Amino acid sequence: MTHPDQKPWILGLTGGIGSGKSAAAQCFTNLGIDTVDADHASRWVVEPGRPALEQIAAHFGKGLLQASGELDRGALRKLIFENPEQRRWLEALLHPLINQEIVSHLAKAKSPYAILVSPLLIESGQYRMVQRLLVIDTPAHLQIERTMLRDSSSQEQVEAILKVQIQREDRLRHADDVLVNDRDHAWLNSEVERLHHFYLTLRGGQS
C-alpha cells in the first residue's frame, strides 16, 4: 500500500461480472470524483502502434488483428479462456503495462480521493495500489440475469465466467466496505452518496 498521507488517497472498487461496478463508478464520477478504469487501461496498452500489440500478434499470429490493425479482443478472449497457459503468458505481458497506465492516470487526479475500478483488483494484485477497498456485491442470480441482458450471453456462458472469477467469499474478505447492489439505480445512487460523504471524512482512506 502507498503512504497514508498521499493526496488524493485511492479507493479500489471491484465486484464480479454483472455486479454494477460501472454504474457505481459513474455515480461517484457524478459527485466529482476522478476514476480510472482498469478495463480502459487494458485497451490503451494494446492500441495500434503500441509494443504490446506487436508482441501479441507475434505470439498468437496476425489472425488476431482486425483489418483496421486493431486487436480482435473477442477472439483473444476466447483463445485464452480455453488455454490457461496462454492466459498466463498474456497476463505476464500486460499486467505490468496496465499498472503503469493506471498509476500514471491516478497521479493526475484532483478530487479529495480517486477511484481505481477493476474487476481483477484482487487477482491481479492491483489492490496494493489502494488504501481502501469497496466491493460491489450482488446475488449470483442477479449477476447472471444482468449479464445475459447486457451482453446477449447465454446462462451457460455467464456461469462459466463466474466460475473462473475469484470466489465471492474471497472478494468480500478483502473488503473494507461492501455495497450490496440488489435494488434499483436510485437506491444505488443514494448508497454511493452515503459512502462518498463518509470517504470525505477519511484521511488517507483510514478512519
From Swiss-Prot:
Where the protein is mainly located, per its record? cytoplasm
Q: Which residues form the DPCK domain?
A: 10-207
Q: Which InterPro entries match?
A: Depp_CoAkinase (IPR001977), P-loop_NTPase (IPR027417)
Substrates-to-products reaction catalysed: 3'-dephospho-CoA + ATP = ADP + CoA + H(+)
Q: Where in the cell is it found?
A: Cytoplasm
Q: What pathway annotation does it carry?
A: Cofactor biosynthesis; coenzyme A biosynthesis; CoA from (R)-pantothenate: step 5/5
**GO annotations under biological process?**
coenzyme A biosynthetic process
The record's section on Pfam families has: CoaE
Q: Which SUPFAM superfamilies match?
A: P-loop containing nucleoside triphosphate hydrolases (SSF52540)
Listed A to Z, the keywords are: ATP-binding, Coenzyme A biosynthesis, Cytoplasm, Kinase, Nucleotide-binding, Transferase
Q: What is its EC number?
A: 2.7.1.24
Class in the EC hierarchy, top level: transferase
- List the GO terms this entry assigns under cellular component, sorted alphabetically: cytoplasm
**Which residues of this UniProt protein bind ATP?**
G18, S19, G20, K21, S22, A23
Molecular function, one GO term? dephospho-CoA kinase activity
Check the record and name the Gene3D superfamilies matching this protein. Answer: P-loop containing nucleotide triphosphate hydrolases
Please give the family membership noted in the entry: Belongs to the CoaE family.
Q: What does this protein do?
A: Catalyzes the phosphorylation of the 3'-hydroxyl group of dephosphocoenzyme A to form coenzyme A.
Its recorded name reads: Dephospho-CoA kinase
